[in-house]
Amino acid sequence: MNWPIHGSNPQYIYNHLQLPMPKNIIDFSVNVNPFGPPALLKEKWIRWFAAVSDYPDPNNSELIEVISEKEKLPRSSILPGNGGAELIGLLAKMFSGKRVLLIQPTFSEYERMCTANGCQISNLILKENDWEIPVDDLSSKLARADVLFLCHPNNPTGIIYSEQLLLQIVNACQQQDCFLVIDEAFYDFTDESNTIASYLKDYNMLIIIRSMTKMYAIPGLRLGYILAAPSIIKELHQNQAHWSVNALALLAGKECLLADNYINKTKTFVSIERKRMVHALQQAGYLVSASRVNFYLVRDPELGDQLPLFMFLVKKGIVARHTANYQGLNGRWLRFSIKQTHENDILLKELLAWKKKS
């Protein structure tokens, strides 16, 4: 049996496998905040409804002002967009025909969008279990690259790297006249600071992507932003469609960025639940990635390909994210998000049952 094509809706998986869809499904493949959107969004939603009758601000002025204050960066260094996917697409267009280096395993959208824009793709595939970046190997590859994409924290492993290593990488890129794009879609789930956004003023070839859909659980609204040198922001903005960010997303985005208590509550919960799950799974004999965010990789070392475990869970109404299409993982791991405690308990129960069964 082949791996099913992963979709954003579990229905695609059950259809592909020709299995009846259980009445109750827990989708662990989606990495959004288990608490759902901040409560203030629901409270203000009706008041915001009038905004759908007007065109949104094409300059995103108020949202940019909030981001500027939060990041302590000039407004000219900020570009909001219709989610991380649109922003990756804008970057791929700017880098059209260039040589792009990807550190694998990583988010597949970089390769998809860059390939669509005629880029030449090369890969640095990290070794399993620790997924450390070999700086010497990376430096030699940078000599033949115009752009490096780094997903940090990494998706799908959840691994983070030290500020010292990140600065080594950005310095190596700068010396090779190579752009460094860091996708920080999950940076705000970690316990510690893991961003080098404050160094943007020192590195004119550093570009940072931020997604707001993950932490704030608003993937249906689509919102994110890029932090970069003003010259880069200007070029990207020229290629961006007018009214790229809708009016409701602009209003919600401002509220989300001010929801500090919500972020702190999420970080604490995710950290506690992740540590609990990882400990229990390791005790049961599973291998687990050293994630620091709201998802983690799991592997039954008694299996090569994890398809049997994936199928076992699917039949129980539990959907994992398989890794068959991640270079360097090739189906040997499954990814699970952190959800509410009772849902995590259901997953743990079934994973323990699998080990007893096998």
Question: Each predicted region: which residue ranges?
Answer:
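Active-site phosphate-binding strand-loop segment of PLP-dependent enzymes
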Residues: N129-D188, L297
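Short, conserved charged micro-motifs
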Residues: A39, L303-F310, H342-I346
